[in-house]
Amino acid sequence: FTLWFGGNIAPLPIVTGALGVQLFHLNLIWGIVAILVGHLVGGVLMALHSAQGPQMGIPQMIQSRAQFGTLGALLVVVIAGVMYIGFFASNIVLAGKSLHGVVDTVPVPVGIVIGALGSGIIGIIGYRFIHVLNRIGTWVLGIGIVVGFGYIFTHVQSDDFLTRGSFNLAGWLATVSLAALWQIAFAPYVSDYSRYLPADVKVSSTFWSTYLGSAPVSYTHL
């Protein structure tokens, strides 16, 4: 649970969620509904992949050989690799901008480098360290999210905050797709974490721990 909760508390989900209003011109209510539907549906596919981990004990990309064959799986690996390079780049750029916003003496490019180095070090240290950081982040950043929501709703400066924008089917479906894809994008590697669980762990336990840690939580951040 904390792995996916902590991993989804970041600037990128917030920026992504804002697209429903900023890019697709939905109002707040329809934007929330679209994001909720997308995450709850997309999260099912993501959590089902996670549930395979303890049962099979191998990385998700290796599992794809059963469906696509050895050569066909290489295409899946390449597509996933390109996707995660973009995901990593987006995160470190926002990390650099966030760091600059907190400490304005740190230039954005330097902040980006710091974010990249920090991510690399965490990855090198490994799996257990990632779990420790996410357990801490769940509490620290979770409290920060609650405080942030409280500040936003008590310091709204615009009279049309709740009514700005309107429903349009194309924008609503695009926002649903965006939210669903946020969850589905984890599927190519989600079982890389759950495969370390005992083989006799219940499938339902793995599914719900992943689903509840990612889908509803990502929804609140977006």
Please give the residue ranges for each predicted region.
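Conserved small/polar residues in nucleotide/adenosyl-binding loops
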Residues: 220-221
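Juxtamembrane transmembrane-helix boundary signature
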Residues: 34-68, 77-83
